[in-house]
Swiss-Prot record:
Coiled coil: none annotated. The keyword NAD does not apply. One of its GO terms (cellular component) is ribonucleoprotein complex. The keyword Transport does not apply. This is Large ribosomal subunit protein uL5. It comes from Mycobacterium tuberculosis (strain ATCC 25177 / H37Ra). Part of the 50S ribosomal subunit; part of the 5S rRNA/L5/L18/L25 subcomplex. Contacts the 5S rRNA and the P site tRNA. Forms a bridge to the 30S subunit in the 70S ribosome. Belongs to the universal ribosomal protein uL5 family. SUPFAM superfamilies: RL5-like (SSF55282). Keywords: Ribonucleoprotein, Ribosomal protein, RNA-binding, rRNA-binding, tRNA-binding. InterPro entries: Ribosomal_uL5, Ribosomal_uL5_bac-type, Ribosomal_uL5_C, Ribosomal_uL5_dom_sf, Ribosomal_uL5_N. Pfam families: Ribosomal_L5 (PF00281), Ribosomal_L5_C (PF00673). One of its GO terms (molecular function) is rRNA binding.
Length: 187
């Protein structure tokens, strides 16, 4: 019987072979566990119109499942808000938390395929860090991912992408994401 080797994601290999050592030299870490890494990626798609038409949530579930390769969790309203005609328990969005190899593959596809496909893309804002090295940004449409068939899109949906790192400061997080290939704008 032959033992098949599991193929490691390209970005994970690059992180382990090059980026980790470069970050250790740059910030002078004494311990290997201090070197920042990406912990998880949370992709969220808000579907506010689903309060009026419950079928719209299915399109968001399908799109997010195609993009991330994982079944999304349907998020429901916690409180009723009369002005928005929203009742407690109505579906208002879908969310996926990616960890491990799926996370590395998603980040690789995001930086090498999806972000360059955005029209008039000038780079990501370097100011959207939260103070402890985590980065959040939004995409206006799901069509930038090649997994989504443009002809089968029922409506354009944006998404929020939250990259959670183990970095202690914004500078460490920025250095990590820049090394991973995130195209930040130069000030």
């Amino acid at each position: 019987m032959t033992t098949a080797q599991k193929v490691q994601p390209r970005l994970k290999e690059r992180y382990r072979s090059e980026i980790r050592d470069a970050l250790r030299k740059q910030f002078g870490y004494g311990n290997v566990m201090q070197i920042p890494t990406v912990t998880k990626v949370v992709v969220n798609m808000g579907v506010g119109e689903a309060a009026r038409d419950a079928k719209l949530i299915n399109g968001a579930v399908n799109d997010l499942a195609l993009i991330t390769g994982q079944k999304p969790e349907v998020r429901r309203a916690r409180k009723s808000i009369a002005q928005f005609k929203l009742r407690e328990g109505m579906p208002v969005g879908v969310r996926v938390t990616l960890r491990g190899d799926r996370m590395w593959e998603f980040l690789d596809r995001l930086t090498s395929i999806a972000l360059p496909r955005i029209r008039d893309f000038r780079g990501l804002s370097p100011k959207q860090f939260d103070g402890v090295g985590n980065y959040t940004f939004g995409l206006a449409e799901q069509a930038v991912f090649h997994e989504v068939d443009v002809d089968k899109i029922d409506r354009v949906r944006g998404m929020d992408i939250n990259v959670v790192t183990s970095a202690a400061t914004d500078d460490e997080g920025r250095a990590l994401l820049r090394a991973l290939g995130f195209p930040f704008k130069e000030n």
